[in-house]
Amino acid sequence: MPDREIKSPIWHPEPGTVEDVFDHTYKEKEGPKPPTVIVWRNVILMSLLHLGALYGLFLFPSARALTWIWFFGCLLFSALGITAGAHRLWSHRSYKASLPLQIFLALGNSMAFQNDIYEWSRDHRVHHKYSETDADPHNAVRGFFFSHVGWLLVRKHPDVIEKGRKLELSDLKADKVVMFQRRFYKPSVLLMCFFVPTFVPWYVWGESLWVAYFVPALLRYALVLNATWLVNSAAHMWGNRPYDSSINPRENRFVTFSAIGEGFHNYHHTFPFDYATSEFGCKLNLTTCCFIDLMCFLGLAREPKRVSREAVLARAQRTGDGSHWSG
């Protein structure tokens, strides 16, 4: 696809790199670990959300067919707000997006309600730079529950806060879409995560307000949350490591399916700037094949970064666990 002029008002220049490469110089502080402080408000809210989601699952068979379609549409839209938006576009700058596409992804991100783009991207860059150390927000060394959801139920480790403050985030601060969403995040969440998913089926085709709230809003929200969390937990514990056997992130097919392409995690932590997050392009990778590649074809995205096949094979042979298809 031919390159577009940066001068065009819908295109914005992006920095070539971001701080998402593991920092081997970091050393955890000696001595006792700081006490774990439970945030009871978060515990209560997460518990209520999942109880509501279970009730939504019970109500799901009674929903109208249009509500099922709406449910899956909202699920995909909010998931893309994380995978194609907060993750691959804003955290890693692995491709460039036009202003309309940025706005679309920011709205999907608000529907996903997993912290605003700025905070999500900051924490994700810290996760990559200090993976599985005290400075990692969802350090998998602390166990499945902590890396899955527990990290959101307690105060952050002091090193997470310290390293997050020192991270270079000028690209995010200069991004008008990111900062606009951050400024109006709470009303955007109320609108996109709860009001729109509930109002549309109730008003447009007469779905029960009860079903409209518990199925497209709460159940959908909880499913996307847990799909994202599985990348932090399961994909750091179970699977093979064909590219770098010295790190914990794994290739996990179940996570790949549930998180629409985010389960090729050993590859992703080895080559974090690759827009596909996988050696295999479209295989089990809805975010890459059906969305980012389509956006590039339509001219709404451009310059997707990719690792050469030669570099991938060389790295797999040098540091992989021997499970790579090339042997």
Swiss-Prot record:
Motif Histidine box-1, residue numbers: 87-92
Membrane-spanning intervals of the chain: 40-60, 65-85, 185-204, 209-230
Residue sites binding Fe cation 2 per the record: H127, H236, H265, H269
GO function term, MF aspect, one: stearoyl-CoA 9-desaturase activity
Chief localisation class: endoplasmic reticulum
EC number(s) per entry: 1.14.19.1
GO cellular-component term (any): endoplasmic reticulum membrane
Localization terms from the record: Endoplasmic reticulum membrane
Cross-referenced InterPro entries: Acyl-CoA_DS, FA_desaturase_dom, FADS-1_CS
Catalyzed reactions per annotation: octadecanoyl-CoA + 2 Fe(II)-[cytochrome b5] + O2 + 2 H(+) = (9Z)-octadecenoyl-CoA + 2 Fe(III)-[cytochrome b5] + 2 H2O
Annotated binding of Fe cation 1, by residue: H87, H92, H124, H128, H268
Intervals of motif Histidine box-3: 265-269
Free-text comment on this protein's domains from its UniProt entry: The histidine box domains are involved in binding the catalytic metal ions.
Purpose: Stearoyl-CoA desaturase that utilizes O(2) and electrons from reduced cytochrome b5 to introduce the first double bond into saturated fatty acyl-CoA substrates. Has high specificity and catalyzes the insertion of a cis double bond at the delta-9 position into fatty acyl-CoA substrates including palmitoyl-CoA and stearoyl-CoA. Contributes to the biosynthesis of membrane phospholipids, cholesterol esters and triglycerides.
Protein name, UniProt field: Acyl-CoA desaturase
Gene source species: Cyprinus carpio (Common carp)
Taxonomic classification: Eukaryota, Metazoa, Chordata, Craniata, Vertebrata
